[in-house]
Amino acid sequence: MDPAAPGLACSILRLGLGLLLLCSWWYPGSAEPRAPPEKIAVIGAGIGGTSAAYYLRQKFGKDVKIDVFEKGKVGGRLATLNVQGQEFESGGSVIHPLNLHMKRFVKDLGLSAVQSPSGLVGVYNGETLVYEESSWFIINMIKLIWHYGFQSLRMHMWVEDILDKFMRIYRYQSHDYAFSSVEKLLHSLGGDDYLGLFNRSLLETLQKAGFSEKFLDEIITPVMRVNYGQTTNINGFVGAVSMAGTDPGLWAVKGGNKLVCSRLLQASRSNLVSGLVMSIEEKTRTKQTGNPSKVYEVVYQTGSETHSDFYDIVLVATPLNRKMSNINFLNFDPPIEEFHQHYEPLVTTLIKGELNSTVFSSRALNEFHLGTVLTTDNPDLFINSIGLVSPVEEDNNPQPKADTAHVWKIFSAAALTKEQILKLFVSYDYAVKQSWLAYPHYTPPEKCPSIILHDQLYYLNGIEFAASAMEMSAIAGYNAALLAYHRWNGNTHMIDQEDLYERLKTEL
């Protein structure tokens, strides 16, 4: 070997390094990362807002101050009601075994999962039980095939196909990819087929697939009524999410699903502000560096006092519905579009008493073995469903007994009158109710509100118009945190990327 070769190689290496350093000095793409924001506001402490705060902390680091505003209780629509010293779920109640964000939260936050009650189910049409489960699997299969052919199997396969594509979102988010609209997120999961589900009614989708009117009326509609208080006129995507709620293995968080929100808030090291946000306005402020910068002034009320503070980034994680969060967006140019879509009223009633089983069948209570009764779309029916429930601390399935009063949960569109309660129960010891604007009223074709309302102003709850569920809100919270992080740092290559599934499936 030429003895001069090592020296020549070193000279070339030094020259190359010098050129690289010179290039990095002037090349604009290699500028230092932008300094993190000083303050971030999250409005709403439900599962969407608290998961967003959790992921914002992970992305932006320990120094940013995060304020989470909540006018009510942490948890939002995840809540419990007390029945004679025991707590029962009154809001979002069950979690699917494939809801990976919720599973991760429970594991990482030191919580425990309990299996949801899985008693026998019947369907009531106002006159009789048109379908009734047996405790024997083979008998259930025979009943379903006898009444509906193989439509239940076809429905299972249809839902499985949609869920299989839906699972792609976890891979995208694990690689930090974000989406600027709900439509782009859905398209990334399943292409035009997913958007088709979103823009057509479940009824139209399933009729085209050859499902019978009898199957739709007696099996599908009752599931929509218990989960979303609506019929098969909802969009096909939320219909699939609703049908997934009939899968085995559903679970909940021991102590109440709302514990996930309070633990996420703690883990994010956010500051909880108990107040009502009244307005958001873009302002220009001079920071410590002496340079003017755009910020958002959040005006909020605590008790009788009005306060304000300034934030670099704001995430709105509460429905922009005048009855739920009357936030005014002031002096934006162009004005921020108002989204006041209708939310469906729902009343949850918990009653401890002895069920009048003869309302649903001719059998006495000691011969009535159903744990849940769903209903068809009959205007004469005043309930969507009724079912036995367990306290949030217990891990067992309640079984009806003739000699013992049990706690039953009833979903209805309006508050039950005393006469209606006495029709459902032979006697009762205690009744408590909670009224909700629970989920959007679905009227496909849907138009989801924008996620990006302004430069650094984001809205999470638009995803509810695709489907409203705990896991959907957690996905929206993660997506909004990633979107805010990438837009703050100019990482446009991490937003709205096409063909992610094909690109990522080849990675190890």
Swiss-Prot record:
It catalyses: an S-polyprenyl-L-cysteine + O2 + H2O = a polyprenal + L-cysteine + H2O2; S-(2E,6E)-farnesyl-L-cysteine + O2 + H2O = (2E,6E)-farnesal + L-cysteine + H2O2; [(2E,6E,10E)-geranylgeranyl]-L-cysteine + O2 + H2O = (2E,6E,10E)-geranylgeranial + L-cysteine + H2O2. Its cofactor is FAD. Keywords: FAD, Flavoprotein, Glycoprotein, Lysosome, Oxidoreductase, Signal. The keyword Flavoprotein applies. Its main location: other. Belongs to the prenylcysteine oxidase family. Its EC number is 1.8.3.5. It comes from the Eukaryota. GO terms for cellular component: lysosome. The lineage of its organism: Eukaryota, Metazoa, Chordata, Craniata, Vertebrata. This is Prenylcysteine oxidase 1. Glycans are attached at residues 199, 291, 356. Residues 1-31 form the signal peptide. SUPFAM superfamilies: FAD/NAD(P)-binding domain.
